[in-house]
């Protein structure tokens, strides 16, 4: 049975509806405290020594008490704050990309169930400039092409409640 999505039929109040002048500079900013950082670095060592497929990782399989508390704060910002959160920050300088991605997967999974990022079912999608030219069959997120403001995964019959991004490398230019 296909469920029809309902269109918004009411105003959204602050803090979810805002303009840049409404927000303090630190809006949505959540600092990764030392306890959570320690849990993540300890888990990074475990995952490096015992490689597992990222998609098989579940937060409840690990002792991540401090990280679960941190992610509850993130969820609070998403649901009752400005609607976004920026975690400052994973210690990427100490992590291999695969391990950082695994930690990101686990943290995001504490908020909600991950969903496919593309029509072909990719659960993790790498946004990077591949040098391809935009056009038919080439997603703009693998090119240098600028994009309009958009909502990721809006094509999904059951779109996600949250979208999460892990920035491994800051772009030389562009972005926010």
Residue spans for each PLM region:
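Non-heme Fe(II) oxygenase catalytic core, chiefly the N-lobe of the double-stranded beta-helix
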Residues: 2-176
């Amino acid at each position: 049975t296909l469920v029809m999505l309902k269109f918004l039929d009411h105003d959204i109040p602050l803090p979810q509806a805002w303009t840049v002048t409404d927000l303090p500079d630190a809006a949505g900013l959540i600092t990764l405290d030392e306890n959570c950082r320690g849990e993540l670095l300890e888990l990074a060592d475990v995952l490096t020594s015992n490689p597992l497929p990222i998609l098989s990782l579940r937060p409840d399989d690990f002792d991540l008490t401090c990280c679960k508390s941190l992610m509850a704060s993130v969820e609070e910002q998403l649901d009752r704050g400005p609607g976004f959160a920026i975690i400052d920050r994973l210690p990427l300088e100490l992590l291999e990309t695969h391990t950082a991605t695994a930690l990101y997967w686990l943290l995001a999974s504490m908020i909600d169930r991950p969903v496919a990022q593309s029509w072909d079912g990719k659960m993790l999608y790498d946004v990077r400039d591949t040098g391809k030219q935009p056009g038919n069959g080439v997603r703009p997120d693998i090119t240098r092409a600028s994009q309009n403001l958009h909502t990721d995964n809006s094509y999904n019959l059951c779109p996600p409640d949250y979208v999460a991004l892990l920035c491994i490398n800051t772009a030389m230019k562009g972005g926010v």
